[in-house]
């Protein structure tokens, strides 16, 4: 631990002051402290000093200087989350000023796609909604075991994933809501399928029989008229009766011929009467 020339602080002490001022939110004082540091390359390459410079640059809206610091130096993984937030928030602010309105979820996604994180503050692992895939894997595994973690378990999950307790709580809440919505949709589809199947069964014809005629077909079907063959058959029978030697029912052989003729006329009237009536009805 060597004292910096003409300054009175060691490198470790400078790093400690930078961390304390950052955590306390004294960013203006932190900026003045950084400005007072001597021109020492070894000191200015200290990671705590570089991180402090990035925070001050963001606070003052000097985003070009911020991007230069983040892209020019390799930072330790434990500093990545903080520096990634600075990178993304700076690009969000610039995009909002350019568009003249706040960014929504889609707008922020497009900014992230357009300005990906530099490898100096990112380990290359794919992220989803700023959650690393490794963190999401831990949360999914716990969700399969218990969708309702206790406050103590949420704190443990936050430590294991590098997330905050609020982020863990929101992840479980959103996941439960998505699962409930998916279950409701699946249940609705099942009910609709069952209802459609029941309707098809009700409309199916009787097994082994012909499809039933609808009531409209029955109401508007015309009455069947006697065909020509029936009329010819009737006339043939009557002629056969006149030439036959056998007596007709109700008559004896000893009856005179005029009685037989009268009975034939009576039989003709009784048979042709309904037939004629039907033909008249059809013609009207």
Swiss-Prot record:
CDD domains: homeodomain (cd00086). InterPro entries: HD, Homeobox_CS, Homeodomain-like_sf, KN_HD, SIX1_SD. The keyword Phosphoprotein applies. Its main location: nucleus. GO terms for cellular component: cytoplasm; nucleolus; nucleoplasm; nucleus; transcription regulator complex. It is found in: Nucleus; Cytoplasm. One of its GO terms (biological process) is embryonic cranial skeleton morphogenesis. Residues 124-183 bind DNA. Phosphorylated during interphase; becomes hyperphosphorylated during mitosis. Hyperphosphorylation impairs binding to promoter elements. It comes from the Eukaryota. GO terms for molecular function: chromatin binding; DNA-binding transcription activator activity, RNA polymerase II-specific; DNA-binding transcription factor activity; RNA polymerase II cis-regulatory region sequence-specific DNA binding; sequence-specific DNA binding; transcription coactivator binding. Expressed in phalangeal tendons and in skeletal muscle and in head and body mesenchyme. Disruption phenotype: Perinatal lethality. Mice show failure in renal organogenesis, a severe reduction of most migratory hypaxial muscles including those of the forelimb, diaphragm and tongue, and severe rib-cage deformation. Besides, mice display craniofacial defects, including loss of inner ear structures. Pax2, Six2 and Sall1 expression is markedly reduced in the metanephric mesenchyme at 10.5 dpc during kidney development. Belongs to the SIX/Sine oculis homeobox family. Interacts with DACH1. Interacts with EYA1. Interacts with EYA2. Interacts with CDH1. Interacts with TBX18. Interacts with CEBPA. Interacts with CEBPB. Interacts with EBF2. PANTHER family: HOMEOBOX PROTEIN SIX, HOMEOBOX PROTEIN SIX1. Transcription factor that is involved in the regulation of cell proliferation, apoptosis and embryonic development. Plays an important role in the development of several organs, including kidney, muscle and inner ear. Depending on context, functions as a transcriptional repressor or activator. Lacks an activation domain, and requires interaction with EYA family members for transcription activation. Mediates nuclear translocation of EYA1 and EYA2. Binds the 5'-TCA[AG][AG]TTNC-3' motif present in the MEF3 element in the MYOG promoter and CIDEA enhancer. This is Homeobox protein SIX1. The lineage of its organism: Eukaryota, Metazoa, Chordata, Craniata, Vertebrata.
């Amino acid at each position: 631990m060597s004292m910096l020339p003409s300054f009175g602080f060691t490198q470790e002490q400078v790093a400690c002051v930078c961390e304390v001022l950052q955590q306390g939110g004294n960013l203006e004082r932190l900026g003045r402290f950084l400005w007072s540091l001597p021109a020492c390359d070894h000191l200015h390459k200290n990671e705590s000093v570089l991180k402090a410079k990035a925070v001050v640059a963001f606070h003052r809206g000097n985003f070009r200087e911020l991007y230069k610091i983040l892209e020019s130096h390799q930072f330790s993984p434990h500093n990545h989350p903080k520096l990634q937030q600075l990178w993304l928030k700076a690009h969000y602010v610039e995009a909002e000023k350019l568009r003249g309105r706040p960014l929504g979820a889609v707008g922020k996604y497009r900014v992230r796609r357009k300005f990906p994180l530099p490898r100096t503050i990112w380990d290359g692992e794919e992220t989803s909604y700023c959650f690393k895939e490794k963190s999401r894997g831990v949360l999914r595994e716990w969700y399969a075991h218990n969708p309702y973690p206790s406050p103590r378990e949420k704190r443990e999950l936050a430590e294991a994933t590098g997330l905050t307790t609020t982020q863990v709580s929101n992840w479980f809440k959103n996941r439960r809501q998505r699962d409930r919505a998916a279950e409701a949709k699946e249940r609705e589809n099942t009910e609709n399928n069952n209802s459609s199947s029941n309707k098809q069964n009700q409309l199916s014809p009787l097994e082994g029989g012909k499809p039933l005629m609808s009531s409209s077909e029955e109401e508007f079907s015309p009455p069947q008229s006697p065909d020509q063959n029936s009329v010819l058959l009737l006339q043939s029978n009557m002629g056969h009766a006149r030439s036959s030697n056998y007596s007709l029912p109700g008559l004896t052989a000893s009856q005179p011929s005029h009685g037989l003729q009268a009975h034939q006329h009576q039989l003709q009237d009784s048979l042709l009467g309904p037939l004629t009536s039907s033909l008249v009805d059809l013609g009207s």
